[in-house]
Amino acid sequence: MGFFSSLSSLFGLGKKDVNIVVVGLDNSGKTTILNQLKTPETRSQQIVPTVGHVVTNFSTQNLSFHAFDMAGQMKYRSTWESYFHSSQGVIFVLDSSDRLRMELLKDELMMVMEHKDVVSRGIPIVILANKMDIPGAMTASDITVALGLNLYRSGTWSIHSTCALTGDGLDKAMQQLSAEITKYMESRRT
């Protein structure tokens, strides 16, 4: 079996390693989402707030992800951009029930979407509208309008409703991200 996996990697048939940056305001559910994406036997039983960054590894059908889970507290947000240049994708997690911080959220999201490394390289961005299970949470379409996402060219970003606690919506979002990253990597080879 080791021989065949080595052979498939040699011919480019194995899983491709990719780096992604996972950002968003504090308490949006970034770490819980990444924990949900891991295999059941590797999931943590207790989630603690991220300080600085933590690397989490997980896989989809064709990609092996190295996710840089970035702290969302204000004092750490300036470090996000130093990871964009070596990433093939960005996940931006937001708390869809946190209406009070929508303006701040918009500013931080625009910083990511307009960052020179993200724009010049065409890095795909998947926005996870998390905590959709909370009563009064905004819908993905309401968030799109509130954040002005409809002003950005489609194809560079997508938004998905999720619930980190149950995993609802994560499969679809990761399929989208995997497809966009695969397309991105293929375009970089030509």
Curated annotation (Swiss-Prot):
One Pfam family hit: Arf
User: Which residues form the lipid moiety-binding region (N-myristoyl glycine)?
Assistant: G2
Q: Which InterPro entries match?
A: Arl6, P-loop_NTPase, Small_GTP-bd, Small_GTPase_ARF, Small_GTPase_ARF/SAR
Q: Fetch the PROSITE patterns from UniProt.
A: ARF (PS51417)
Main localization, broad class:
cytoplasm
The UniProt GO MF terms for this protein read: GTP binding; GTPase activity
Q: Which family does it belong to?
A: Belongs to the small GTPase superfamily. Arf family.
Name used for this protein in its record: ADP-ribosylation factor-like protein 6
According to the entry, what is the taxonomic lineage of the organism?
Eukaryota, Metazoa, Ecdysozoa, Nematoda, Chromadorea
Chain's gene name: arl-6
